[in-house]
Amino acid sequence: MAAGALRGLPVAGGGESSESEDDGWEIGYLDRTSQKLKGLLPIEEKKEKFKKAMTIGDVSLVQELLDSGISVDSTFQYGWTPLMYAASVANAELVRVLLDRGANASFEKDKQSILITACSARGSEEQILKCVELLLSRNADPNVACRRLMTPIMYAARDGHTQVVALLVAHGAEVNTQDENGYTALTWAARQGHKNIVLKLLELGANKMLQTKDGKMPSEIAKRNKHHEIFNLLSFTLNPLEGKLQQLTKEDTICKILTTDSDREKDHIFSSYTAFGDLEVFLHGLGLEHMTDLLKERDITLRHLLTMREDEFTKNGITSKDQQKILAALKELQVEEIQFGELSEETKLEISGDEFLNFLLKLNKQCGHLITAVQNIITELPVNSQKITLEWASPRNFTSVCEELVNNVEDLSEEVCKLKDLIQKLQNERENDPTHIQLREEVSTWNSRILKRTAITVCGFGFLLFICKLTFQRK
């Protein structure tokens, strides 16, 4: 009985009798263990509640648990912090709360930064933009790269977030950084078919000539993935907007990029300036001068015009007759690229027939269009500098470009002459070959005429550029 009564009491360890001594040690040991578990359970329960609150996005419960002592930088599975998880689901409100509580915006786990997580999050662009803006305001590095050397701007470009791309650049993100495969943000946008991202990156100074590790440019990546509009856009050499936003301050860039459509319709100072130049030359060459004001009012650049679909033409008030002229000109500009270096010797010999002649014809036709464009701009250019209504840069800039054009035309003329001599040499060798069956004289004469016309056209284009250069120098 006494022993039984003793078992029911909280006896301390180290009693008199052997029985009570054993029981007392056990009771004392169990008491300390139970007290330790009781101290841990509330913390574990809080952590579980915290995880659930983060999962369902319960901001008030998250704040309550943070007030109760949960660390804002506690880690979840795989070592993620609450801020990284909130960024991964693009929960801007949770991101703001955690940052206000002192969460580390520069935290990384296995080369995965919180900013990269936000840029690659699944959610609306509006929410992703808010998260990225909050992280950048807490000095998150916009150029930090993951294990594959991809930066936040590459993820944003890949996923088609135009405003996020612009915001990152405004905070110092490098546009032309390349990942482990040589992809830039522009390459990723071209690969995924994000036309607006491509246009925006070109405005921000993206280099469309940078090649991947396997020697492909963004235009070739777009063509390989069947994004023909983007291929045409990147293949077109004129770029009136390239790098226009690079010289703006961070505040100006953010203002330009993040304005609403209504704001853009009200303010055309910037857009009108950038649209002036190549667009007018192109329209003059097609006899579509009457469209200049319409396109400038709608902030349509030359690149945009050349990549429009039929419904976009109609939406912007462009008549079917004018559409046909633009589409015909665009079709003439699309010369199918022939990669001679990738072909075998036998294939090269096969290419040198009708397809090569077609290539020369198209080249000759394009030179003719360039001559017409220069002639039009010469006739339209004011003789008196006081008649120029828009503010121009220093005339030296124009003359230096004209000098480069003249040099390029001279180089082109030299290469065409080399091509002509080479073909003439091959033709003479074939004529002197006794085993060769002579072609009809008409074909030979026709080929010679084509080559002569091409050479004359190139020389004429160089002469016109030389006149244009002298005109600028006189001014």
Swiss-Prot record:
ANK repeat intervals: 45-74, 78-107, 110-144, 148-177, 181-210, 214-243
Region: Disordered, residue numbers: 1-25
Keywords of the record: ANK repeat, Cytoplasm, Developmental protein, Differentiation, Meiosis, Phosphoprotein, Repeat, RNA-mediated gene silencing, Spermatogenesis
Keyword Nucleus in record: no
Disulfide bridges in this chain: none
PTM annotation (Phosphoserine): residues: 17-18, 20
InterPro entries, alphabetized: Ankyrin_rpt, Ankyrin_rpt-contain_sf, Asz1_SAM, SAM, SAM/pointed_sf
Cellular localisation: Cytoplasm
Residues annotated as domain SAM: 272-334
GO cellular component annotations of the record: pi-body
GO BP terms in the entry: cell differentiation; male meiotic nuclear division; regulatory ncRNA-mediated gene silencing; spermatogenesis; transposable element silencing
SMART domains: ANK (SM00248)
Function text: Plays a central role during spermatogenesis by repressing transposable elements and preventing their mobilization, which is essential for the germline integrity. Acts via the piRNA metabolic process, which mediates the repression of transposable elements during meiosis by forming complexes composed of piRNAs and Piwi proteins and governs the methylation and subsequent repression of transposons. Its association with pi-bodies suggests a participation in the primary piRNAs metabolic process.
Subunit structure as annotated in this protein's UniProt entry: Interacts with DDX4, PIWIL1, RANBP9 and TDRD1.
Name the record gives this protein: Ankyrin repeat, SAM and basic leucine zipper domain-containing protein 1
Phylogenetic classification of the source organism: Eukaryota, Metazoa, Chordata, Craniata, Vertebrata
